[in-house]
């Protein structure tokens, strides 16, 4: 009898052990399944996060590319000259910080044949003294400073500082061979021919430069309608730059019909800039780079 009871007890114990083992196994597999599900879910979340990050980066790059392309329509007139003294590193730095990659230089030549950057033919307005650049030696010009202590820049100074990180919209204030030759020397020395839009009020300078730099865009600056119409007939003129009183849809269309880009100067009010954008102007000069780029984003290619 005791033997029978012992067998029963042993059987019960075995049953319980097996049951517990089965239960433990079930728990193990459930935990394993749960763990696998958690890992799969975590991987899915990580993949979603990765895809979202990639989409955000792609969107950021697209926005950055669009902003860059829109800024290409904006020529920073003498740098950010509404905020800093014109044609100084401070003015150029500010324009670039505002999103510009097209900064303007006006070139004058010294008695020593060096190209300096100044809108005026004399240094009086910017430096308060000096006289005509063409009558001053390099050492005399180098001794001059602006009202806030900045030096009068050479074209080579600007190339040294910015290199090929920006485009240079360079106006020759004279079409004489001395200025044109000096310009070529500096451009060739720094290998900048692909970084420049050259502009002049006189066609002869542009014609002379066409021989040396056929692929360099040439901008003819015009102040009256007859000059505008005449400029359209010149094959070496790539861009017609009009004073803003000549900025109109009809002139813009004429330029495009002749295979020329249409440019206007100098636009500073919102209405002027918006008008240029809406009529399809390819570029324009402004003293307010940051505002112009904002308006480009809002109105360029906006069909409403």
Say what each PLM segment does.
Residues 2-304:
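Phosphate-group recognition and catalysis centered on beta-loop-alpha active-site segments
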């Amino acid at each position: 009898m005791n033997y029978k009871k012992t067998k029963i007890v042993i059987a019960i114990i075995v049953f319980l052990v097996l049951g517990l083992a089965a239960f433990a196994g079930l728990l193990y597999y459930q935990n394993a399944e749960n763990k696998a599900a958690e890992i799969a879910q975590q991987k899915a979340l990580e993949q979603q996060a990765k895809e979202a990050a990639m989409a955000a980066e792609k969107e950021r790059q697209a926005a950055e590319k669009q902003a860059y392309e829109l800024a290409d329509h904006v020529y920073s007139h003498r740098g950010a000259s509404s905020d800093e003294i014109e044609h100084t590193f401070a003015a150029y730095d500010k324009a670039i910080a505002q999103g510009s990659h097209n900064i303007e230089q006006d070139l004058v030549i010294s008695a020593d044949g060096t190209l300096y950057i100044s809108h005026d033919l004399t240094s009086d307005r910017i430096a308060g003294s000096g006289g005509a650049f063409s009558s001053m030696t390099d050492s005399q010009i180098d001794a001059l400073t602006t009202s806030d202590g900045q030096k009068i820049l050479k074209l080579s100074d600007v190339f040294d500082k910015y290199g090929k990180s920006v485009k240079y919209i360079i106006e020759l204030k004279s079409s004489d061979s001395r200025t044109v030759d000096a310009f070529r020397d500096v451009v060739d020395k720094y290998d900048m021919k692909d970084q420049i839009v050259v502009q002049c009020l006189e066609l002869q300078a542009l014609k002379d430069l066409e021989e040396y730099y056929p692929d360099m865009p040439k901008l003819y600056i015009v102040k009256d309608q007859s000059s505008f119409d005449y400029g359209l007939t010149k094959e070496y003129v790539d861009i017609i730059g009009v004073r803003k009183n000549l900025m109109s849809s009809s002139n813009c269309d004429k330029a495009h019909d002749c295979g020329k880009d249409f440019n206007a100067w100098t636009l500073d009010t919102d209405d002027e800039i918006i008008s240029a954008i809406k009529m399809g102007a390819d570029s324009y000069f402004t003293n307010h780079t940051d505002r112009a780029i904002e308006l480009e984003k809002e109105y360029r290619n906006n069909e409403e």
